[in-house]
Design a protein with these regions (language model features):
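Conserved PLP-anchoring active-site segment centered on the Schiff-base-forming lysine
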Residues: 111-129, 147-148
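Short acidic/histidine-rich motifs immediately flanking catalytic phosphotransfer sites
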Residues: 159-166
Length: 191
């Protein structure tokens, strides 16, 4: 037999949409719990506690051009949505984004910049990042400075009013140099 508190809780759960329950309890979760359950919302269709892996390619629509939240798995699906929520929960952020690769994430970030903007990056970064910066994004009038980020002075000397991004990859690839992220963040905010 359920206690009054348990009955009250069950009644409240039925009244409050799952997204709000998630918001209420996520702040009390510890890191390991957030990593696993932070993005979970009870499945309204089947009641699954953990999000299943959705492997469908397309979703049924109510009518042409009026989807119910998802259209194609290549753009988004419930599995990825909950993963992004879990990442946001771990980071205590409102939103999280997942990409198919690191270069896809870099591409999305760099595309928020405008012609004439300058980016300071480590001179020892992943070759794919370097080629993306030099061969693709310099064509869009972005200016990249590649410096030794282990020396904060070399970064500080280059920062100017056009600097919009300090790109840090640490540990670096291939040399495995470690950039002091805290000091780099302080330097960026100072300027």
């Amino acid at each position: 037999k359920l206690s009054n508190k348990e009955n009250d809780f069950k009644r409240i759960i039925k009244l409050i949409p799952n997204i709000f329950i998630f918001a209420l309890i996520k702040k009390k979760m510890k890191f390991n719990t957030k990593a696993i359950h932070g993005g979970q919302i009870l499945d309204p269709a089947y009641g699954s506690v953990m999000t299943p892996i959705y492997q469908t390619s397309t979703y049924a629509q109510s009518s042409p051009g009026k989807h119910k939240g998802y259209e194609y798995s290549r753009t988004h699906n419930p599995t990825r949505t909950n993963f992004e929520r879990a990442i946001a929960s771990i980071e205590n952020a409102e939103y999280g984004l997942a990409f198919a690769s690191g270069l896809a994430a870099i591409d999305a970030i760099i595309k928020t910049l405008s012609p004439g903007d300058e980016i300071i990056s480590t001179n020892d970064l992943y070759g794919g990042s370097y080629r993306l910066f030099k061969q693709i994004f310099e064509k869009y009038e972005l200016k990249f400075h590649f410096v030794n980020m282990e020396d904060l002075t070399s970064v500080e000397e280059i920062i100017n009013s056009n600097t919009k991004l300090i790109w840090v990859e640490t540990p670096t690839n291939p040399m495995m140099n470690v950039v002091d992220i805290k000091s780099m963040s302080f330097l960026a905010k100072k300027k």
